[in-house]
Amino acid sequence: MAGAACCFSDEQFREACAELQKPALTGADWQLLVEASGITIYRLLDQPSGLYEYKVFGVLEGCSPALLTDVYMDLDYRKQWDQYVKELYEKESDEQMVAYWEVKYPFPLSNRDYVYTRQRRDLDVDRRKIYVVLAQSISAPQFPEKSGVIRVKQYKQSLAIESDGKKGSRVFMYYFDNPGGQIPSWLINWAAKNGVPNFLKDMVKACQNYHKKT
């Protein structure tokens, strides 16, 4: 994956790998939000925005780390299995690959869209093969804001994946975005407690069907 090397440091990749081995939940007020179906989600209040950062840990059975990472990176395929995607594509901008992503929101809320860059690295850490994908929002004039769609200008995500020692994957995900506008608290709570686990389950199903897509 061609990424914006300038946007992500080696330290950011190392931090994601370290979280996979030992979750960094001390020294801050991380709260356990939900634990179900092998997925555990913690949240931390981001004081400036009043929103939450999230950390997700879990095991996804029946999907190898390499396959899971390939599916996660395949934006064209995601349009087939992610029901919330309205538009998703990637193109070159200022000598780096930039992704555009519009997300469907329930009526009467406006859809949100993201402009972001991402980078994948397949790392060997203490004889462990770890796949890491980092993503963050950027400003790119080639992607002007659309009428009726709210641009998410603060978005950051980390994903680290390794084998669970069987046929599945151990996963760590960090996630934060500021969706802007007035989002009902029930929708924010639903997205955190149900949206993330459901997304991971859908991604496992997508892995199982990945070889059939062509």
Swiss-Prot record:
Gene Ontology MF terms: phosphatidylcholine binding; phosphatidylcholine transporter activity
Domain START positions: 1-212
Gene Ontology biological process: cholesterol metabolic process; negative regulation of cold-induced thermogenesis; phospholipid transport
Keywords: Acetylation, Cytoplasm, Lipid transport, Lipid-binding, Phosphoprotein, Transport
GO CC field: cytosol
UniProt keyword Acetylation, yes or no: yes
UniProt: a 1,2-diacyl-sn-glycero-3-phosphocholine binding residues: 72, 78, 157
Origin superkingdom: Eukaryota
Annotated localization: Cytoplasm
Modified residues (N-acetylmethionine): 1
Tissue-specificity statement: Abundant in liver of pups but levels in liver decrease 10-fold about 2 weeks after birth. In adult, highly expressed in epididymis, testis, kidney and bone-marrow derived mast cells.
Positions of post-translational Phosphoserine modification: 139
Quaternary structure and partners: Interacts with ACOT13/THEM2.
Protein name: Phosphatidylcholine transfer protein
Originating species: Mus musculus (Mouse)
Name of the encoding gene: Pctp
